[in-house]
UniProtKB/Swiss-Prot annotation:
Pfam families noted in UniProt: Cyclin_C, Cyclin_N
Gene expressing this chain: CYCB1-5
GO biological process: cell division; G1/S transition of mitotic cell cycle
Species: Oryza sativa subsp. japonica (Rice)
Protein name according to UniProt: Cyclin-B1-5
Bias (Low complexity) ranges: 8-37, 136-147
A cellular component term, taken from the record's GO annotations: cytoplasm
One term of GO molecular function: cyclin-dependent protein serine/threonine kinase regulator activity
């Protein structure tokens, strides 16, 4: 009987004995590894000496002669890698799937910033340079190796915008801060008589009502009465009002009734003082708690008129005015405008002095009471040399600008300058008293003279 070694020697040998032996060893090793629990598959060798001469033809790997093993994925990758290295060494580039070449990006045009924008452009360029590494990294990490394209467009100020900004700056057309208007009623919140909740509505109504039933230019319709006679009557009314110690509202309403009646009815010269006395009686009954007696009015007229004359003229005036004597006078606006000016007692006395001087001026009889009151405040500001002369608060509450008041205020300042030499100086002597601060003795405003 032949032994095991003799049978092995007598068996026919394969053509490639080395390959068969190697295959048997690999199979035995794989079987042994599969039999061991927890065993891992052996990694492919990094270098296989017997495939150094592998070739790639039409994207397929051609094994050397004598190698018949199946080509796995990892084994094929190793063969391809080795073949590419050999081809590169021989200056022959082997590419498995040649990709489509993309045209190289054109270099970006260089933008030269203007001198005034050099700092901004340099700052923006520095920011873009800092962003370049991150953008290249993002392109490298994209799937498929495709580079991401970022469109970076620099913001450059156009020539038109630059010229427009320069023109506005040269012409002074810039955004000016809003004018600050002071809340003049903030201290009267707890005063119910101040009616802070609807004080603005009240004065808006006054501004509308002052345009109704205004005296007109009546001197052309008067035959025996002229502006000088009216000024004499107004000066006498101021004197009587001061001696009777009546309310200020009574004085301004008296002059309104006189002017309104003269606008509607021609009056004889001898009856002009009678009209003034009857108008004061009407205003006193409307404004005062205790109106003067008719006998007292007869006395101040030096008994020129009887009781029947005064009462008859009173009735005639009321009928001619249709009993409409509820009108805004300059006094109601003076109170509001003095408060807006934030004036002290000296400014208040000076304003009332100019307003009483305005009562003697016939040219101001037909003007709006708000305009006369605002002009008196402006003239007082100029006389006392207050700064600023006209604030945004005064402009808001009066509704007039400084230029709108200048002409009317100039008339008042001229009357103040002529008062010491005038025969009609009742208001001048009244406000020269120590009780009223002697404001009439102040020198007239030079800026309006």
């Amino acid at each position: 009987m032949a032994t095991r070694h003799q049978r092995a020697a007598a068996a026919p040998q394969p053509a490639n004995r080395g390959a068969a032996v190697a295959a048997g060893k690999q199979k035995a090793a794989a079987t042994a590894a599969a039999g061991r629990p927890g065993a891992r598959n052996r990694q492919a060798l990094g270098d296989i000496g017997n495939v150094l001469n592998a070739h790639v033809v039409d994207g397929k790997i051609q094994l050397p002669e004598g190698i018949n093993r199946p080509i796995t994925r990892s084994f094929g990758a190793q063969l391809l890698k080795k073949a590419q290295e050999n081809a590169v060494a021989a200056n022959k580039i082997v590419v498995q799937n040649p990709a489509r070449k993309e045209p190289a990006p054109k270099p970006a045009k260089k933008v030269v910033p203007r001198p005034e924008n050099a700092a901004k452009a340099s700052t923006g360029a520095g920011v873009n340079e800092n962003k370049k590494p991150s953008e290249s990294e993002g392109a490298g990490s994209s799937s498929g190796g495709s580079a991401l394209k970022y469109s970076r467009k620099k913001v450059v100020n156009t020539l038109t915008s630059v010229l427009t900004a320069r023109s506005k700056h040269a012409c002074g057309i810039t955004e000016k801060p809003k004018e600050v208007v002071e809340d003049i009623d903030k201290l009267d919140g707890d005063n119910q008589l101040a009616v802070v909740e609807y004080i603005e509505d009240i004065y808006n109504f006054y501004r509308t009502a002052q345009l109704e039933r205004r005296p007109t230019d009546y001197m052309s319709s008067q035959v025996e009465v002229n502006p000088k006679m009216r000024a004499i009557l107004a000066d006498w009314i101021i004197d009587v009002h001061y001696k009777f110690e009546l309310m200020p509202e009574t004085l301004y309403l008296t002059m309104y009734v006189i002017d309104r009646y003269l606008s509607l009815q021609p009056v004889l010269r001898r009856e002009l003082q009678l009209v003034g006395v009857a108008a004061m009686l009407i205003a006193s009954k409307y404004e005062e708690m205790w109106a003067p007696e008719v006998q007292d009015l007869i006395h101040v007229c030096d008994n020129a008129y009887s009781r029947q004359h005064i009462l008859a003229m009173e009735k005639n005036i009321l009928n001619r005015l249709q009993w409409n004597i509820t009108v805004p006078t300059p006094y109601v606006f003076l109170l509001r405008f003095i408060k807006a000016a934030g004036g002290d007692k000296e400014l208040e006395n000076m304003v009332f002095f100019f307003s009483e001087m305005a009562l003697k001026e016939y040219g101001m009889a037909s003007l709006c009471p708000s305009l006369v009151a605002a002009s008196a405040v402006y003239a007082a500001q100029c006389t006392l040399k207050r700064s600023p002369l006209w604030t945004s608060t005064l402009k808001h509450h009066t509704g007039f600008t400084e230029s709108q008041l200048r002409e009317c205020a100039k008339v008042l300042v001229n009357a103040h300058a002529a008062a010491p030499e005038s025969k009609l100086k009742t208001a001048y002597r009244k406000y020269a008293s120590e009780q009223l601060g002697r404001v009439s003795l102040r020198p007239p405003a030079v800026c309006l003279a």
